[in-house]
Amino acid sequence: MLSLEDGTLAVKTARNVIEEYVKTGNYSKFELPKTFDRPGGVFVTLSINHDLRGCIGYPYPMEDMSLGEALADAAMSAATRDPRFPRVHKNELDQIRVEVTILGQPELLKCKPLERPHHIKIGRDGLIIEYGLHKGLLLPQVPVEWHWDATEFLENLCLKAGISPDAWVEEKAKIYTFGGQIFEETEPGGPVIEKKIA
């Protein structure tokens, strides 16, 4: 668990990386506390007026990358490499709110496929699906924002992976749950809070 101080530092680091990269095409080396030296999963989400503007990250800890390095890469990628959106332009920087989700270790959901909705807690769990070559991930805050129940969460997870919305009922579909700590700006460039969604 990160403290609010560390979470604030994570969000401010993400913003600094984004602003510098969008303006110059590069970003400077930065220093973070030892908390960020370990490997860890992280996502950076950008929004303008509560509309998604970019979201990229690492669902699993990377052996060759610290949490701090993953954070910086996810921030830069959310601004410039999300295939759903054009690159963030420097004119947008003062409109963008930055959110950082630090992910817990994903755990395989071990139950019969039709029982999966009963083992998912909205507001606590994020989901990952692996279905053959298809993979998809939805962060814990997504079903809360869209007012989905657990079944709708699973269906939309399948759609995110590019498969049929009912593929989650198949044995070959592997579903993983994970927790997350969410830190976000209250306004673009403003104070950072830990977002509670449960």
From Swiss-Prot:
Pfam families: AMMECR1. It comes from the Archaea. Residues 5-194 form the AMMECR1 domain. Disulfide bonds: none annotated. This is Protein UNCMA_24250. It comes from Methanocella arvoryzae (strain DSM 22066 / NBRC 105507 / MRE50).
